[in-house]
Amino acid sequence: MSSHRAEEIEASDTCTVARPADGKSAGRADASVPISPPRLGMRLWSAGLGRLLEIAPFLTTLVLLSVYPMLRYLLRDPFPAEVFRFGFISFWIGFLIVNMVRAQKTRQAILHAMEVDWLGRLRGLQAPLSHYAIFIPLKNETNRHVLYRTFRSVERLQYPKSLVTLIPIIEAEDRVTLEKLDEVVRQVAGRMQVEVFSYPTDRVPVKCKATSISTCGRWLTARIANGDFAGGPGGIRVLIIDADTLLHPQDLAFREYTHREEEAQAAARGVRGVVLQSLTTYTANYWKVPMLPRLHNTGFVLYQMGKMQSRGDYLVLGPGTSMDVGLFEAVDYFEPNRHNEDMQFRYKVVMEGYRVAPLKIPTWGQAPLSTQDSWGQIARWARGAVDAKFIVAYRQRFRDRRLPIANSKPVQALRALLANAMPPLTVLLPAQLILISWISPCVRDVWPTPVFLSPDVLALKHAGRSLCVSTMAVFNLVFQTIVLTSSTLLGMVVVPYTLKPIIYQRPPRRWRRGRTFLEWFRLVFTPINLHNYFLMATAQLYTQGKLALGLPITHTPVTRK
């Protein structure tokens, strides 16, 4: 078992980043470590900008959610409001259909990738294979079975055992996790290469997964430089997964093949390098909780699969990130912070001139969650989904390169703000349109029978005039009803077909028949999951609101039990 003394890290509670004070960091100002400026004006400007950037995500969401009510009730002419309504409904259904079409293409590619012998193909090409160092940061892991299944998935990889080293990363003070880890390591001893990396945290102010990964990355880099870590013929790559991640047997071989293809294309396009991110989905091992609603099993996975067909960078949350060890060192590892370090790493990579490319093969998370735990899990995902403050404050390392406009900091910051606002927007704005339309007098014009709480009673009027003054308002009500109903029916047919073979592994034999029926039933009747989408939207608003009010959002509930 290796042990490594953590380097001194400087940070404050208001920072998003804590960085080691080593020689390599010299000459580069930290992304948000406060450096006392000589003048009071500069200090006030820095503090004010920081608070504005913390408020910006919440403000962006509120502004976008208030556009339609303001257009409808503040203007004398309701026509602009109806144009906005028609445009958003068209965008909403168009986005859904495009994602479904793209997801179908991704589905075919994923199913194909899971069946091909990629190692045999690499050997047929006589391609030199890379040595993969698989980082698994551990924190408060009390379920030995979850750890064992993760280790077993690594053991089953169809890749030379000598070129796979599993490196669990653990804080020296985390005795409970260390005890569980020792039990699992003893079980797999002799069957795979495992090097446990333990480091003390007495001088580490920001104790998080990013700190663990960065500390281990520097330790591994030093070992490589000293010749203590043998590389493969194709070099050394780092793969980062979570403690509950299951890898497909073809993962490393397909990853190596994809790395070579993407890097060849990157060189032709003038990109510095490539980071791969695999599709994040979930297994059927949460069969213990029948009919369990999981947000990621429908909308989020569908969105991920759609994004895999885009030409842009694949900035999606999840384990399964891999890159060359030299690239990992060049971008100075992860950024320890109180938000989501995965997303900060990906944004940093893009701004430094690298590409984040999708790996069209799934990694499965195996943790069962109760409905109560879902709030903590979704709030944890929402917490840093995007950190515009990090993007604005970050200072690039490679300033001598001319990057595309799409990779620039202003564009990435705007992208971050919009991405942060999209979950509440796509859930709450359709609900807002429905509610407002049902208190409109237009309902009387298109509904054949009187409805509960007559529109004449609930209708809001402006200067004595009805708000339903155009045929477009009537058309929008019909159009909205048809679109939202058809999207539900479309989801009942397409989503189960698209996701079921990718999300689920086989449940235990004694549960197989009943579980198959329950899973299909839950996926087909997608309205059952509507409350989960509202849970996602409110969790995002809750997190943004705490950040805007200056309240701490550091705490991450441990949901993997």
Named regions from a protein language model:
Residues 189, 206-232, 249-339, 371, ...:
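Long helical/loop segments within the catalytic core of UDP-sugar-dependent glycosyltransferases
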Residues 359-373:
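Active-site donor/metal-binding and catalytic loop motifs
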Residues 347-363:
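Catalytic donor-sugar/metal-binding loop of nucleotide-sugar-dependent glycosyltransferases
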Residues 131-135, 165, 344:
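Cell-envelope/extracellular polymer assembly enzymes that use nucleotide-activated donors
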Residues 233-248:
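Short beta-strand-to-loop acidic/aromatic patch adjacent to the donor-nucleotide binding site
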Residues 169-184, 199-205:
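A conserved acidic beta->alpha catalytic loop
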Residues 2-52, 62, 89-131, 394, ...:
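Juxtamembrane C-terminal module of membrane proteins
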